[in-house]
């Protein structure tokens, strides 16, 4: 079996590569990693680096050729051409990072492609809360919507699910969209407090307005701060927790406190 991981040097793609190696590496099959610069990718020696970029579909035909399974990182701007190339190459199964809401067109294109697929729809990433790093160091988090309920999931858990799906019998998962969450739903205020618990530091939470929130987040997030805060001015639904990570991998998702403890250097 040949598995191609796209976005293989990105935040989640690289984790998928590492998880495939942990699950068996070459015993699973030929693991290939799509990257724009193989020389700088620093991939493990057992992984075959393939040059290409999802943003330039004309670089992808050779990458998909001979690929049985593909982990598809999200790149909505070229999703139509990318899916067509996978169909032409005879790709047998796609595990795609996707979702609902603003990802709906991307998800719909995958569902309509004719490819055997499973989609993963994570909510808020635990890693997004690194944006609070400077505030948590100061002991006070100011947030635009502290009572909004979320169930953040770590990128490591998302990658574990993707790798397990790529290597497990696929029939039960075909056509599914799995929402991926952490183990418990919390208000954003409680998320901040749980990060504090994970690193052993009390954290106070105060509500704030849009302008103040943007001023606090822009130094960390750049222009992404505006897009992120726009979400809270839309009809953003609370996110309930589920046990899909545990059901799909056999190991429960880590909590935000556990994630913070592993990433303590972001907050102290």
Protein language model regions, located:
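Generic detector of short alpha-helix boundary/capping microenvironments
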Residues: 1, 146-147, 238, 247
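A hydrophobic C-terminal alpha-helical subdomain
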Residues: 211-268
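Adenosine-nucleotide cofactor-binding segment
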Residues: 47-48
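Periplasmic-binding protein-like
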Residues: 71-73
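Oxidoreductase cofactor-interface core, primarily capturing Rossmann-like NAD(P)-dependent enzymes
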Residues: 2-44, 55-61, 65-67, 77-204, ...
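Cofactor-binding loops of NAD(P)H-dependent oxidoreductases
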Residues: 51-53
């Amino acid at each position: 079996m040949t598995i191609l991981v796209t976005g293989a040097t990105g935040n989640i793609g690289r984790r998928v590569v590492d998880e495939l190696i942990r699950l068996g590496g070459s015993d699973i099959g030929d693991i290939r990693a799509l990257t724009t610069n193989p020389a700088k990718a620093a991939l493990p020696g057992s992984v075959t680096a393939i040059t290409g970029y999802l943003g330039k579909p004309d670089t992808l035909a050779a990458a998909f050729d001979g690929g049985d399974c593909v982990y598809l990182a999200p790149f909505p701007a070229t999703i139509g051409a990318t899916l067509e190339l996978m169909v032409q190459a005879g790709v047998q199964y796609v595990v795609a990072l996707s979702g609902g809401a603003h990802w709906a067109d991307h998800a719909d294109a995958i569902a309509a492609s004719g490819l055997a697929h499973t989609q993963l729809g994570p909510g808020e990433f635990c890693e997004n809360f690194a944006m609070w790093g400077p505030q948590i160091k100061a002991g006070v988090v100011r947030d635009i919507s502290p009572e909004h309920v979320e169930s953040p999931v770590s990128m490591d858990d998302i990658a574990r699910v993707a790798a397990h799906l790529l290597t497990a019998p696929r029939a039960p998962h075909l056509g599914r969209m799995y929402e991926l969450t952490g183990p418990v739903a919390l208000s954003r205020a409680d998320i901040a407090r749980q990060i504090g618990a994970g690193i052993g530091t009390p954290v106070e939470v105060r509500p704030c307005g849009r302008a103040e929130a943007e001023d606090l987040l822009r130094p960390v997030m750049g222009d992404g701060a505006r897009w992120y805060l726009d979400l809270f001015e839309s009809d953003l639904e609370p996110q309930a927790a589920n046990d899909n990570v545990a059901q799909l991998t056999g190991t429960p998702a880590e909590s935000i406190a556990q994630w913070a403890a592993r990433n303590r250097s972001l907050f102290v």
